[in-house]
Each structure stands twice: as C-alpha cells, then as structure tokens.
Amino acid sequence: MSTLRAKRSMRLDARHLRYRRTQGEGAVLHCFLLDCSGSMLAGERLARAKGMLVALFDRAYRERATIALVCFGGGRAEVRRQPGAAHWFNERWIAPIGGGGGTPLALGLSSAATVLERAARHRPAQRRWLWVLTDGRTNEKPQAPASADEIVVVDFEEGSIRAGRGKALALDWGARYITADALSEGGDHSYHRGV
C-alpha cells in the first residue's frame, strides 16, 4: 500500500517503490535425524518418534521453516527428505518409514552433516538446527556436526534402567536435551543445554 500511496495519481516509477524488510523464506532449516534401529521398535518408540515428526513438521509448515529428514538404522543412513518446505501432508510419507537392525549413529550424523553443509553453502544466512531423535542405544561417540548452529537431542530411552546415552551425547556436544515425554507434553521450549 505504501508504494501506491507514494505514487498517487502519477505514473509508477522506481522512486515510488517502497520496500519492507522481511525475513527470507526458509530462514531456518530443521534437519531431523531419526533413529530407525531395532531398539526403537521396542515399546513403539519409532511410532512415537514418527508421530512427533509429523507434529514438528506441521509446526515448521506454520512457521514457513525448511525441513530435512535423515533416517539411520540397520547399518545404513538415508536422506529421506532433502531440505525443502514443509507440507500439510507430511504423515503420508512419514508413515511408511520402517526400522530394524543396528544403530549407525556416526553414519546418520555424517549424512546429516552433508545435508547441513550443502544448505550452508547455498544459504549462508540460514539458521540450521539438527534434531536427533534416538534412544541412544549405541556404543558410537561421534563428534557433533560443525555445520549445525543448534542441536537438540530428543531422548526416547525408556524403562527403569537407563543408560543415559542420549543425555551424554547432548553433554558431549553442548547440545540441548529433552526427553520425548517432555516434548510430547508441549515442552518444546523446556529443553536445556546438556543436563
């Protein structure tokens, strides 16, 4: 409207144009790293994680954030969704994701790091978040990807005896930590660094 007010009844030219600074499309990338190993099948943790992904993707859709998804399990890692806009139909392509086998966390992180590094080259001003959804059942202790501005470890470990590996990863990486239960209860802002 301000451009039209400046123009009034005159012919439109460059001096009449008014610009409004806005945050660029996809100013934030949320890259999700989903543990699809056999241990996540126990207690329907993988199903809970996929439901949580749908909710987080829906939130990204409302916020016009960019999303990516890397799945790891069974000795391999796969980029299931390259960075792009979130859509309202996320459940359709998340539901068929299966699980089983070992927990190649380092391989998954390597794939996520590649996605984040490529995004950093194409959009250097974009803020890059890495969300690691895992039960932490791995003996690997990989380094955190340097290309992530923020890392959130969402811990799906359950049971009376817990190894605490998800929390240990968050501490090692200086990452934010939240349990799956706390995130499910709407505590998406209650995660905290390391503890």
Name these PLM-found stretches:
Residues 110, 168-195:
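C-terminal helix of von Willebrand factor
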Residues 35, 135:
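Residues that scaffold, gate, or flank divalent-cation-dependent active/transport sites
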Residues 29-31, 127-131:
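Structural motif
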Residues 27-28, 38-69, 85:
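…and closely analogous acidic/polar surface helices at protein-protein or active-site interfaces
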Residues 77, 88-128, 137, 155-164:
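Von Willebrand factor
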Residues 66-96, 141-144, 167:
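Short beta-strand-loop
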